[in-house]
Design a protein with these regions (language model features):
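Single conserved hydrophobic/aromatic residue that forms the stacking wall/gate
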Residues: 1-7, 11
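Catalytic cores of Mg2+-dependent Asp-rich isoprenoid enzymes
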Residues: 9-121
Length: 121
């Protein structure tokens, strides 16, 4: 019941639109159309219906796999991979990820300016 409760609170939360918008911004900032494919295919497999969108988009943008099975103490969490056919991330992917994140934020700022100018007109 807790799983259903947590999932339904994620779906009904105010993060629904921002999560998807963030995924779209990351995909657009990657300048790679296949990132949209990865996001659309893999986001729904994440345990969080909201976190999966930007995470799947970043996995596609970096060309690496993210999430997947992991260990918390003695407990193994069997999470699915996002962009599972790709290789594991390397240290250099942190810098690349930050660059992709910055590009996505520039796109977000441009969108906000356009919206503000339209509302002002």
């Amino acid at each position: 019941t807790r799983l259903v409760s947590d999932w339904s609170s994620d779906v009904c939360s105010s993060d629904l639109i921002p999560a998807r918008l963030t995924g779209l911004l990351i995909a657009a900032a990657s300048f790679n159309p296949s990132v949209f494919t990865v996001m659309m295919r893999d986001a729904r497999h994440h345990r969080s219906p909201n976190a999966g969108w930007p995470e799947a988009s970043m996995a596609g943008g970096l060309g690496v796999r993210l999430s997947g099975p992991r260990r918390y103490g003695s407990h193994v969490s069997h999470e699915p991979w996002l962009n599972g056919a790709a290789s594991d991330p390397q240290a250099v992917d942190i810098v690349t990820g930050l660059t992709l994140y910055r590009r996505a934020m520039v796109l977000a700022a441009i969108l906000l300016v356009i919206i503000a100018l339209e509302l002002k007109a």
